Amino acid sequence: MREISVPAPFTVGEHDNVAAMVFEHERDDPDYVIYQRLIDGVWTDVTCAEAANQIRAAALGLISLGVQAGDRVVIFSATRYEWAILDFAILAVGAVTVPTYETSSAEQVRWVLQDSEAVVLFAETDSHATMVAELSGSVPALREVLQIAGSGPNALDRLTEAGASVDPAELTARLAALRSTDPATLIYTSGTTGRPKGCQLTQSNLVHEIKGARAYHPTLLRKGERLLVFLPLAHVLARAISMAAFHSKVTVGFTSDIKNLLPMLAVFKPTVVVSVPRVFEKVYNTAEQNAANAGKGRIFAIAAQTAVDWSEACDRGGPGLLLRAKHAVFDRLVYRKLRAALGGNCRAAVSGGAPLGARLGHFYRGAGLTIYEGYGLSGTSGGVAISQFNDLKIGTVGKPVPGNSLRIADDGELLVRGGVVFSGYWRNEQATTEAFTDGWFKTGDLGAVDEDGFLTITGRKKEIIVTAGGKNVAPAVLEDQLRAHPLISQAVVVGDAKPFIGALITIDPEAFEGWKQRNSKTAGASVGDLATDPDLIAEIDAAVKQANLAVSHAESIRKFRILPVDFTEDTGELTPTMKVKRKVVAEKFASDIEAIYNKE
């Protein structure tokens, strides 16, 4: 199958907009707890009425600052409660939210401010505000910087005070004037070359995403469910899901404290989480490693295989009596503990940003946590395809979100069009023209649609490796297999214009400590110290051989190199959503890549 379309069971009217639901909830269900926010370490209830009052006050404050419809307003902050409130306030006055990662460099922030000509910026911390102050001479359009946290008055208080003299009828008029075709957000996304491009999404794009998500997941997105958002809200996935949750009256909490995520989950007790595959891989690998360190590695291995077998059997008519009995035993011994680590009430998750892998998907479903995998880009307002609660095929990213169509081009590239697809790049007609063909958005991803209409993503078009022998290799297949090993943190497949495929491997710091202990290595030895250790080489070689089973001989990894350091966002090799920056890795570790191909 080359094309599939799913009609929308809803409509988006001329005046439909994102902010409208804030005041609809206030009118229809004022006392319902729509948010919980952290105040001095305690999750504190925020009702629909309280949230609407804060959003209204912030919106009036923006009006008092002279923010006009269509003006760009930057949020330069990590995920937190205030982020969502400010976002709704910006949208309510008809302005355009420009999200910026809290880890952005000064040069990145400068470009966003210059290109968007933003008039107001919300800075999270003192250091963020200081960075922006140092840029003031080069961003003439910026009139106001308000600080969300840190020293001095906070942004919400300042906006409330400033807006106190504004007639609320001003906001009512702004809301009434909103059109679904109006711009809502400008998301800067890096291209293959040059500076980041501003991806323009309209109110209609976001409303289509919100309603489409609800149509596919009425049992996850419904009143009474609980969602903890810990991915960056600057990323379209987290923002779109949190908006969809708000629309469906899911109680939402926010945190960016990833180091203390497990204690947060234990207290918040979400019923659903949204994450990227690397987090699910890490949870699995940590559980496997902890079992090995406790001398229970074999028990965990059998439990993991039982979970996979049970899930696969569910797709074939259901597990038999013996498998059900084994599954019940391991549910008490293993799976229940895994679910407890996520707060005890979590029964489903949404994964996006990269392929999850069929084995991991089957494991989690077998362990009692179904992961609904989706696919999307900034240009598709978040998800353009997602697995459904009642129509799931593990290993795929599901079918189009209602109101959208998918097509596979002759060269395998995935093309999309529909309600969630963006209108173009900000002030960049050339890039917009290049991004579309006959009205279809060229995603840059390679995919396939099976006979049942399920989409599988096989890799990025620009990441395809062409060896010296002319073999095309999609690195994601091998890399996903390698990261499944508990000792491996990241893997980057190389080999463009080279005689064979190679790989750079980084070691998981936590797993490494347990491995050293089990293999009687010096406690203080670093990965660099043991990079050529025969036992470590043998362990990674076994993982490489296992990964190679997923590809042909010509695509298999012939040699690998263990790097002395892991990739991190701080050192520049990972994006905020934990994707590897291949170009950065290739430049930083050029000598290691060359060493793979040096004749010995």
UniProtKB/Swiss-Prot annotation:
Enzyme Commission number(s) from the entry: 6.2.1.3
Metabolic or biological pathway, per its Swiss-Prot or TrEMBL entry: Lipid metabolism; fatty acid biosynthesis
PROSITE patterns given in the database record: AMP_BINDING (PS00455)
GO MF annotation terms: ATP binding; CoA-ligase activity; long-chain fatty acid-CoA ligase activity
Reactions catalysed, as given in the entry: a long-chain fatty acid + ATP + CoA = a long-chain fatty acyl-CoA + AMP + diphosphate; dodecanoate + ATP + CoA = dodecanoyl-CoA + AMP + diphosphate; hexadecanoate + ATP + CoA = hexadecanoyl-CoA + AMP + diphosphate
GO biological process, one term: fatty acid biosynthetic process
Signal peptide (residue range): none
Pfam family name, one: AMP-binding
UniProt GO cellular component terms: peptidoglycan-based cell wall; plasma membrane
Keywords: ATP-binding, Fatty acid metabolism, Ligase, Lipid metabolism, Nucleotide-binding
Purpose of the protein: Catalyzes the activation of long-chain fatty acids as acyl-coenzyme A (acyl-CoA), which are then transferred to the multifunctional polyketide synthase (PKS) type III for further chain extension.
Recorded family membership: Belongs to the ATP-dependent AMP-binding enzyme family.
UniProt name for this protein: Long-chain-fatty-acid--CoA ligase FadD15
